[in-house]
Amino acid sequence: MSFKQYRSIDLILFVIMYGVCEYLAIKAATVWFDEPYCISIMLPMLAIVMMRWDRYSIIHAVVYALLFVYFQSGSLTQYFIYLIGNLGFMLLLLYVKKVTKEKIRATFFGSMSYLLIGFLLMEVFRGLASMLLAGKDAGVIFTFIMTDMLSLVFAILVIIIVRRIDGLFIDQKQYLLELNSQEERIDGGWQDE
């Protein structure tokens, strides 16, 4: 399998996982329990995909926003608000480039800073989009942050867990090169001369 094929399969699997989990979370909150709150898996999934695939996570930012609003039966304005919010999250790539994925992964503080900055970017851009497209006042940014606080707590827990799973919260190109290097060392030790 080529690297491009691996990346494509991985990206597709993350879209499917997101779609299923988000659909179930939204239906649980709106249909099964009729509560106004729901925990979204969007933030941790975007953070994981960005860590794995850098700029390719923009595909997920767009698809996740579209699926989220679709599952909520949202309006056209909401589509734009969530698209803009998720594209705001993509500014996190600048942080990743400056700090490096290795430093982000290396410590709890690095991973949580990465997640929190992404969360704030997403919420601020959603708020700004709401101000521009729906005529909301600046308080809408605070509203977005507060309504998504449960999702942030959930995202923190997810990132704590995935940091401990080998190969999940890491740049995939680097990870595959490391695996290949380990394989060559192991195989090299067993070759007959």
Question: How would you label these PLM feature ranges?
Answer:
Residues 48-62, 101-102:
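Membrane-helix interface "capping/anchor" motifs
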Residues 19-22, 65-66, 86:
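Residue-level recognition of pore/gate-forming positions within transmembrane alpha-helices
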